A protein has these predicted regions:
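Asp-box/BNR beta-propeller blade signature and adjacent active/binding-site loops
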Residues: 1-178
Length: 178
């Protein structure tokens, strides 16, 4: 959940449900800052049980950010920049427990990018960036969603446009080598 004050300060918070979404309970703030705007956060649970929050930002040069909970979502560490631009982010666990992180790149050349992180998502600053597409028409792209097709193939779908044209949903099939 994202919230905003009259002064424009934003924060994101964790809400939990123990009855499949019928009722929700407030857990804790994930990230807040006096100048950085947070929104469109995705969560990922690591094999060790950490909850990793991948945060979209504004007023921070579109930097991807991360925060981590090591206590089951009762609290999160101070957010930090991941060292690259891209948003919103989406994580998918691979069969070998590595993590495919997908995101839109909303700067020239506009496109869709991925990184493969270690199982605990601790190597985000050094994981190589892989460009899936760099032919977007403008910055109105992204919202990736990766899905395992089988153990070696992933379909990454996303919102896209070419030459500032009609917006559409497109996809790229990746082959993962282990």
């Amino acid at each position: 959940m994202a919230s905003s004050t009259a002064e424009g300060i934003t924060s994101v918070h964790l809400m939990t449900s123990d009855n499949k979404g019928l009722n929700w309970n407030y857990s804790c703030p994930i990230a807040q800052d006096d100048s950085v705007i947070f929104n469109e956060t995705s969560l990922y649970e690591t094999p060790k049980g950490d909850i990793v929050a991948f945060l979209r930002t504004a007023a921070f040069d579109d930097q991807a950010c991360i925060a981590r909970s090591t206590d089951g979502g009762k609290s999160f560490s101070k957010w930090e920049s991941m060292g690259f631009q891209g948003h919103p982010l989406n994580a998918l666990r691979l069969p070998d427990n590595r993590v495919l992180l997908t995101y839109g790149y909303r700067h020239q050349p506009f496109g869709i990018r991925v990184r493969i992180l270690n199982p605990e998502c601790t190597d985000f600053a050094s994981a190589p960036e892989i460009i899936l597409r760099d032919d977007g028409g403008n910055s109105d792209i992204g919202y990736t969603w990766p899905v395992m097709m089988d153990d070696n193939h992933i379909l990454v779908t996303y919102y896209f446009n070419k030459d500032n044209g009609i917006r559409h949903i497109a996809g790229t099939i990746l082959e993962i080598k282990y």
